[in-house]
Amino acid sequence: MTVPATRNDLMIVNMGPHHPSMHGVLRLIVTLDGEDVIDCEPILGYLHRGMEKIAENRTIIQYLPYVTRWDYLATMFTEAITVNAPEELGNIQVPRRASYIRVIMLELSRIASHLLWLGPFMADIGAQTPFFYIFRERELLYDLFETATGMRMMHNFFRIGGVAADLPHGWIDKCLDFCDYFLPEVAEYQKLITRNPIFLERVEGVGFIAEEEAINWGLSGPMLRASGIPWDLRKVDHYECYDEFDWEVQWQKEGDSLARYLVRISEMIESVKIIQQALEGIPGGPYENLEARRFDRVRNIEWNDFEYRFISKKPSPTFELSKQELYVRVEAPKGELGIFLIGDNSVFPWRWKIRPPGLINLQILPQLVKRMKLADIMTILGSIDIIMGEVDR
């Protein structure tokens, strides 16, 4: 529904898909009455790659490299949900050490995602300096990822029943050093940004979402928590080993772009607290549990007296998905990332439905920008934090 216009000569403006402030290949058809936004229509699909259909023709391990292309700035979460679904379907237990390693990697990935949200968000509203500051910390994070997984991005590190490799020697000390270094840097961001009068002028009261509205639109993550609802799946669903750590859900009640900024800044501090506790208390033991399961089933996997499945363990171990269905979710940096999986007693999923947080959160954008100024569109869009790889899939 459009807003009533005050004049006859309305202007229609295309923002994107190639726009300096656009977060990926999103196109907005904006109807303007002078500087006031009358209507906004998002056009999606420029980055659609058929990820759900690809999943139906791949084993889980073969599919892992694809999922890192959804939200390519927080790839650990897409990997986590991809292995969590078959783990729950097959009731596979994850060793405690593997669970601790997963939590450490997930929280490091959350910090990296929030950092790369903060820099462009500030650049969108006219503050260029933080954009360069965040890359300083992000480089240190990517060095940690590269040391542990071999890749700076697209890590391909999670496996069914654990992780691909144990933490290398000296990595824990290096990660603890990063945590000690990073906390003062977050304090510096807050000192530079949070009480800056120009910043407050651009974000305070802009893009307001009420509590009931956030629930009705199905929002999740910082979008939901900034509207006064302390809902975090790490506390609600008790997955991995988050219950073993002392940390708080970060939320605000104002519901505007400033509140969403404050939630994400605070979440980075909480992530550091979780990482420090996990590093200091990480147990010994195996980092994956598939080996024992293979030996248990050795009688069933012989073919012409040749145990082919052992040979194929590293490139692509097969794992049959039983004939049942389930929904699995994790708390990604942008919100609730979920998978609806239907098995069919095959190594391939019968259905693999992705619930991307960015797509759901983006639905409220047209309502938020109506009656606002043209310049506020990028502030509001930036505060939502979308990655078009997961929106279009």
UniProtKB/Swiss-Prot annotation:
<comment type="function">
    <text>NDH shuttles electrons from NAD(P)H:plastoquinone, via FMN and iron-sulfur (Fe-S) centers, to quinones in the photosynthetic chain and possibly in a chloroplast respiratory chain. The immediate electron acceptor for the enzyme in this species is believed to be plastoquinone. Couples the redox reaction to proton translocation, and thus conserves the redox energy in a proton gradient.</text>
</comment>
<protein>
    <recommendedName>
        <fullName>NAD(P)H-quinone oxidoreductase subunit H, chloroplastic</fullName>
        <ecNumber>7.1.1.-</ecNumber>
    </recommendedName>
</protein>
<dbReference type="GO" id="GO:0051287">
    <property type="term" value="F:NAD binding"/>
</dbReference>
<keyword id="KW-0520">NAD</keyword>
<dbReference type="InterPro" id="IPR029014">
    <property type="entry name" value="NiFe-Hase_large"/>
</dbReference>
<keyword id="KW-0934">Plastid</keyword>
<keyword id="KW-0813">Transport</keyword>
<dbReference type="GO" id="GO:0048038">
    <property type="term" value="F:quinone binding"/>
</dbReference>
<dbReference type="GO" id="GO:0016655">
    <property type="term" value="F:oxidoreductase activity, acting on NAD(P)H, quinone or similar compound as acceptor"/>
</dbReference>
<dbReference type="GO" id="GO:0019684">
    <property type="term" value="P:photosynthesis, light reaction"/>
</dbReference>
<dbReference type="InterPro" id="IPR001135">
    <property type="entry name" value="NADH_Q_OxRdtase_suD"/>
</dbReference>
<keyword id="KW-0150">Chloroplast</keyword>
<keyword id="KW-0793">Thylakoid</keyword>
<keyword id="KW-0618">Plastoquinone</keyword>
<comment type="similarity">
    <text>Belongs to the complex I 49 kDa subunit family.</text>
</comment>
<keyword id="KW-0874">Quinone</keyword>
<dbReference type="GO" id="GO:0009535">
    <property type="term" value="C:chloroplast thylakoid membrane"/>
</dbReference>
<dbReference type="InterPro" id="IPR022885">
    <property type="entry name" value="NDH1_su_D/H"/>
</dbReference>
<dbReference type="InterPro" id="IPR014029">
    <property type="entry name" value="NADH_UbQ_OxRdtase_49kDa_CS"/>
</dbReference>
<keyword id="KW-0521">NADP</keyword>
<dbReference type="Pfam" id="PF00346">
    <property type="entry name" value="Complex1_49kDa"/>
</dbReference>
<keyword id="KW-0472">Membrane</keyword>
<keyword id="KW-1278">Translocase</keyword>
<comment type="subunit">
    <text>NDH is composed of at least 16 different subunits, 5 of which are encoded in the nucleus.</text>
</comment>
